[in-house]
Amino acid sequence: MAGHSKWANIKHKKAAADAKRGKIWTRLIKEIQVAARLGGGDASSNPRLRLAVDKAADANMPKDNVKRAIDRGVGGADGANYEEIRYEGYGINGAAIIVDTLTDNRTRTVAEVRHAFSKFGGNMGTDGSVAFMFDHVGQFLFAPGTSEDALMEAALEAGADDVSTNDDGSIEVLCDWQAFSAVKDALEAAGFKAELAEVTMKPQNEVEFTGDDAAKMQKLLDALENLDDVQEVYTNAVIVEE
């Protein structure tokens, strides 16, 4: 991937997230409920819950909302019937797409996901058809101007697996997804606050899209992300703004 688009894509992602904060809160509440139901309500001993709570804080969700979601999850009320289902498929020019959902009605969800794929030029794949093209990792992105040497030393000491600098000067740190919270805490303790910090499915190879193909691909991704049951959408497509 060209370095010039890395930072631009992250900033675009953050702006888009801010624009639909209400929807993000709804998704986070579902994730918090499920995490608490499966692993208990103590974030210090439940990595999945800790990650969801951290995301909620980053999204400026009130703490009372977070606490209520945890209590509902532990109590087995709302969220008790949510099922995690992953769908895989292809976008424009065969770009790989992973769609993670939390649903209480898998028939409804698969129909909506399939419809979005077919309506906007993609198609559903089978289980495992594209997941092998991605790595499950913790990812941090730091703004251009961050001290590369100091960050690299802190990151490697914290247990990160890889530190790389993009052409635009932004710095990316990768770690095992299970070590995400520990690495995040260590980096912040060392004075490094990431612009983006998440557990993600990172594509092993990325494909840039421009012009009409970029517009078509963005419409497909937006259609998938706007579905109520969808939690995350991952792709190896990079939309280059011209």
From Swiss-Prot:
GO cellular component: cytosol
Entry-linked InterPro entries: Integrase-like_N, TACO1_YebC-like_2nd/3rd_dom, TACO1_YebC_N, Transcrip_reg_TACO1-like, Transcrip_reg_TACO1-like_dom3, YebC-like
Keyword Transcription appears in the UniProt entry: yes
Principal place of residence: cytoplasm
Keywords: Cytoplasm, DNA-binding, Transcription, Transcription regulation
Signal peptide: none
Localisation: Cytoplasm
Pfam families: TACO1_YebC_N, Transcrip_reg
Keyword S-adenosyl-L-methionine in annotation: no
UniProt-recorded Gene Ontology molecular function terms: DNA binding
UniProt family annotation: Belongs to the TACO1 family.
Full protein name: Probable transcriptional regulatory protein Bcep1808_2379
Organism, scientific name: Burkholderia vietnamiensis (strain G4 / LMG 22486)
